From Swiss-Prot:
Protein family according to the UniProt entry: Belongs to the ATPase B chain family.
Native source organism of the sequence: Synechococcus sp. (strain CC9311)
Name of this protein: ATP synthase subunit b
Membrane topology classification: Single-pass membrane protein
GO cellular component: plasma membrane-derived thylakoid membrane; proton-transporting ATP synthase complex
Source species taxonomy: Bacteria, Bacillati, Cyanobacteriota, Cyanophyceae, Synechococcales
Gene Ontology MF annotations: proton-transporting ATP synthase activity, rotational mechanism
Purpose: F(1)F(0) ATP synthase produces ATP from ADP in the presence of a proton or sodium gradient. F-type ATPases consist of two structural domains, F(1) containing the extramembraneous catalytic core and F(0) containing the membrane proton channel, linked together by a central stalk and a peripheral stalk. During catalysis, ATP synthesis in the catalytic domain of F(1) is coupled via a rotary mechanism of the central stalk subunits to proton translocation.
Residues making up the signal peptide according to the UniProt record: none
One of the Pfam families matching this protein, by short name: ATP-synt_B
CDD domains assigned to the protein according to its UniProt record, in alphabetical order: ATP-synt_Fo_b (cd06503)
PANTHER family: ATP SYNTHASE SUBUNIT B, CHLOROPLASTIC
Compartmental location: Cellular thylakoid membrane
Keywords: ATP synthesis, CF(0), Hydrogen ion transport, Ion transport, Membrane, Thylakoid, Transmembrane, Transmembrane helix, Transport
TM segment ranges: 25-45
Amino acid sequence: MTLLFPLIASEGGFGINLNLFETNLINLVIVIGVLYWFLKGFLGGMLERRRETILKDLQDAEKRLKTATIELSKAQEELSAAQQKAEKIRLDGQARAEAIRADGEKRTIQAMAALKQDALADLTAEGARLTEQLRREAALSAIDKALAELPNRLDSKAQAKLIDSSISNLEDV
């Protein structure tokens, strides 16, 4: 053992000194007691103030958390309401666009039908006018031809016979 601890062996061994004055135990107790007595108020007050500050900060944080939670809930409700309103507006817009499109198609079809009827009426009127014009021209041509041939065919006897038959036809009526 002396080989391991040469310093201990040179001092004469390992032991505890129980003499209070040599170990300064009384001085240490007095210094520690005085430090405890003086620092108790100072450190205690400092720690108490720190504890109160921490508690106040925690209470403020809890209040802010509750307020933030309430505001978040309100904001989520408002967001939900806004999304519902936006969806309603979108659906209304689609319905309105569909109604406008259908109305436009209906008006276009009606306008096309009216144009077709007008064109048909114009075509019918033009056909009737052309038919009437052709009749007049045919009648005028026949009259001109008859007038041109009439003097050669009618002599005075034929004229008298024609006049008599016309008068008898008029009397029957």
